[in-house]
């Protein structure tokens, strides 16, 4: 991904996923330095501190990597009015899509369904 890693932003209080952006080494260092999520804008080719203009900055409460160390999760507190998306919504994930169900019977995680582990 040309030195970019996806950064998922989640509300630390509610757990809601707010947005996805990309970070490079410079934006990651800036995030660590300031305590506010800073992305690399792929369209503008420059650093982008989310909320710097609107006042809805993303204060990092905690951060983690995924199991492959190729994605970041930021749990944040949103400053300002809390509207993270440029479309004026709390989350950027507001456009539902229909996906036909592929389920055939019970699935692990459903109530009463447990995974069986073969330790043989």
Task: List the predicted regions and their residue ranges.
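C-terminal binding/interaction regions
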Residues: 1-4, 12-13, 17-18, 23-120
């Amino acid at each position: 991904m040309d030195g970019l890693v996806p950064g998922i932003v989640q509300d630390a209080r509610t757990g809601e996923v707010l947005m996805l952006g990309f970070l490079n080494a410079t934006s990651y260092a800036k995030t660590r330095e300031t305590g506010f999520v800073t992305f690399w804008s792929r369209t503008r080719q420059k650093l982008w501190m989310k909320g710097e203009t609107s006042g809805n900055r993303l204060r990092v409460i905690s951060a983690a990597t995924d199991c492959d160390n190729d994605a970041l999760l930021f749990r944040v507190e949103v400053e300002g009015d809390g509207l993270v998306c440029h479309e004026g919504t709390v989350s950027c994930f507001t456009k539902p899509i229909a996906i036909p169900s592929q389920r055939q019977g019970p699935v692990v995680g459903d109530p009463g369904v447990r995974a069986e582990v073969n330790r043989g």
